[in-house]
Design a protein with these regions (language model features):
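Glycine-rich phosphate-binding loops of nucleotide-dependent enzymes
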Residues: 1-192
């Protein structure tokens, strides 16, 4: 695995965090959150070494950071001490994003970023992804939601059976869902 041209060997969560990478899983409940812990803890736990280099958690600093991300990402909750399990799916997804932003991630992998969230939350996540990209954060989005792919992507890699079969270098108004489906299924591109 190479990150920014440097070989990092076998990836691990620690190596990825050290390389300023974050991963927003499609299964936030299993791989992204500690559901029975407060929002405050979920926001800071991936970056404990960076946020608290002494190894001692400064709860006031932790609260300030969590509150900053609650406001910045518009996480709908009156209290960062609430357990994440009490939040809606869209707000849980924002907590996962806040966790990785608190580590100063320069590259984020979004795996099905809006699966299982309502339309309003979906639009908010799209806005956040777009804003991060404009700020220079590298974004790799894996999605089966083709309208989402077409809306948010500058470049699309179409895969079939684990292999890249097409690179669409510039996404334009002429790029269609049918074209992507044709490449993904091995269909005739002229049908698109």
């Amino acid at each position: 695995v190479r990150i920014c041209g440097k070989s990092v060997g076998e990836p691990s969560p620690t190596k990825c965090i050290r390389q300023k990478m974050g991963f927003i899983s499609e299964n936030r409940k299993e791989f992204g959150l500690a559901l029975n812990l407060p929002i405050r803890v979920n926001v800071t736990h991936a970056g404990l070494k960076e946020i608290f280099p002494s190894g001692i958690v400064d709860v006031k600093k932790e609260r300030r950071l969590a509150e900053e991300y609650r406001q910045k990402l518009r996480i709908a909750t009156p209290d960062i001490e609430r357990n994440v399990v009490s939040l809606s799916g869209g707000n849980q997804q924002k907590v996962v994003l806040a966790k990785w932003l608190s580590t100063n991630s320069e590259f984020l992998v979004f795996d099905e970023p809006t699966r299982g969230i309502d339309v309003g939350a979906k639009e908010e996540i799209h806005r956040l992804i777009d804003e991060l990209a404009r700020q220079g954060v590298g974004i790799l989005m894996i999605s089966s939601d083709l309208p989402e792919v077409l809306t948010l992507s500058d470049r699309i890699y179409v895969m079939r059976e684990g292999q890249i079969v097409k690179e669409i270098e510039t996404v334009t108004a002429e790029t269609t869902q049918e074209e992507i489906i044709a490449y993904a299924t091995g269909g005739d591109r002229s049908d698109a």
